[in-house]
Amino acid sequence: MTKKVVTITLNPALDLTGSVNQLNVGSVSLVGQSSLHAAGKGVNVAKVLSELGAQVTVTGFLGRDNQELFCQLFEQLGVQDAFIRIAGATRINVKLVEQSGAVSDINFPGIQVTEADIEAFEATLQRLAQDHDYFVLAGSLPQGISPQRCAGWIAQLRSMNKKVLFDSSRDALLAGLDAKPWLIKPNDEELSQWCGRELTTLTDCQQAAAELAQKQIENIVISMGAEGVMWLHENQWLHAKPPKMQVVSTVGAGDTLVAGLCWGHMQRMEKESLLRFATALSALAVTQVGVGLGDREQLNTLQQQIQVSALYPTMGA
């Protein structure tokens, strides 16, 4: 077992989150509660892992001009800060959460990364690889980093026998898949984009995941919202279905799932227990505003309500 893990956030963001009754596109929407906090997929994963008890080192690229909220968060969590500071300001992303639970994301492109910044990051990655086995690479890419370069880092870590959990989308996901990360966690929408067809049922998702398995990725985890989580490992399929949850916000639920999967593997949980734990953690996340562990007692109760079942391979799987 290990408690040490590195989370990599290449394109972090300050999330400006606001709650609205209903988003009026092309008109005025009045925001009720609002918050501005340090985020980015890898940062969110780090927060949950830290609260679970992991010894987390965070790295990636941070703009010098507005790093204060990140520094405060890292200090509060007690994580090791190995972010590369670069010129400019980290982007601000806007998330509007409607009363129905629907979330509209307005994501900006991110800061410009130079070749010198990249060299500093690569040196940090090499150093961290000396005494860490688990790496979570999550989120989008900033300007200046190509999907192929990102995939090269995955391949490099893999060649050193490191376990890379990779959670991204679009071109970064496509390139990263070819580097054979140890675990990937696309949601059903990202899986649909990858295979180029609509996925409306559990069987559809299972068939697409089976096609993805041909890329020889050891762990393929598909998050499907209220339908739960599907995991393909060593030709075995498991499906975890949570009870119906009162959705407050889906922001960070996928990142929480990644953190749960990572922690479960680090703690060498048995497969069904691991999937039950990670699914419960993610299901609990949608009942709260903000990313974090929430109520431990509620988590334990929810784990007992998660149904985990084996799935049979689909035709062609």
Swiss-Prot record:
InterPro entries with a match to the protein in the record: 1-PFruKinase, Carboh/pur_kinase_PfkB_CS, PfkB_dom, Ribokinase-like, Tagatose/fructose_Pkinase
GO cellular component terms, semicolon-separated: cytosol
SUPFAM superfamilies: Ribokinase-like (SSF53613)
Reactions mediated catalytically: beta-D-fructose 1-phosphate + ATP = beta-D-fructose 1,6-bisphosphate + ADP + H(+)
Molecular function per GO: 1-phosphofructokinase activity; ATP binding; phosphofructokinase activity
Summary of the function given for this chain in its UniProt record: Catalyzes the ATP-dependent phosphorylation of fructose-l-phosphate to fructose-l,6-bisphosphate.
Protein name per the record: 1-phosphofructokinase
Organism field: Vibrio cholerae serotype O1 (strain ATCC 39315 / El Tor Inaba N16961)
Taxonomy of the source species: Bacteria, Pseudomonadati, Pseudomonadota, Gammaproteobacteria, Vibrionales
The encoding gene: fruk
